[in-house]
Amino acid sequence: MWRTLLAALLATAGAQYERYSFRSFPRDELMPLESAYRYGLDQYSTENWPESVSYLEVSMRLYRLLRDTEAFCHHNCSSAGPLTAPPPADGELAELRLLAGVLRRAQCLRRCKQGLPAFRQAQPGRELLEEFQRREPYKYLQFAYFKANNLPKAIAAAHTFLLKHPDDEMMQRNMAYYKSIPDAEEHIKDLETKPYENLFVRAVRAYNGDNWRTSISDMELALPDFFKTYDDCIAACEGSREIKDFKDFYLSIADHYIEVLACKVQFDITT
């Protein structure tokens, strides 16, 4: 059903984030992330390059939608804890107060997610999400773009993948070939660039050129978006978690909490 609905849109779709909007995501593109991605890979394996490109691009937008929606709900519910500072308590009363804050936040998240389309779809597993975090789809997009005779996007996809996998020999060879093409340099860009990154680079260039006013201005403009991106990445660590083992109540809570903390310590803001 969703393949039929999407057919007309895919024929004219641009790059994966052109016209992307968190608040007004096209209904015709809404589908399970895993379904879109697996179908794109199926078309890749049968060498149906235009169809593969279209669905791989849609899967990238769906992943961003899921990530942005998760961050939106967690930011909105970040204060849904204890209503006032509780007096010191011991034993069961302290435990109940702690759990009350957890339950209030859980209720807030549940209500938030119920009203957003990203969570009305079947949710992807952790392994698939990590594949997107590693920018693995760009490995397939690069070759599909190339076979579809779209060299500018193939070059950009190869560069975007190499930023996360600088030692990948196959992609290094592909990039070496692309760089031998006239005017290839203008297409070497990171398709996952955050808005603050361009401002920061511009600020550094102004700094190196002793243009202090411009450097200060651009750096000040970059900082708010950097901290927003940082907060969004941290919020993503508190997203859905697959429960594979049956454990005691406290062991389960402890494992989940440690997993979230490890994610926050180790996360990469460039993903």
UniProtKB/Swiss-Prot annotation:
Keywords: Extracellular matrix, Glycoprotein, Secreted, Signal. InterPro entries: Collagen_mod_leprecan (IPR052284), Leprecan_dom (IPR056585), TPR-like_helical_dom_sf (IPR011990). One of its GO terms (cellular component) is endoplasmic reticulum. Necessary for efficient 3-hydroxylation of fibrillar collagen prolyl residues. Belongs to the leprecan family. Found in articular chondrocytes. Expressed in a variety of tissues. GO terms for biological process: chaperone-mediated protein folding; collagen fibril organization; negative regulation of collagen fibril organization. The gene is CRTAP. Residues 1-15 form the signal peptide. Glycans are attached at N76. The keyword Methyltransferase does not apply. The keyword Hydrolase does not apply. Its main location: secreted. It is found in: Secreted, Extracellular space, Extracellular matrix. It comes from the Eukaryota. This is Cartilage-associated protein.
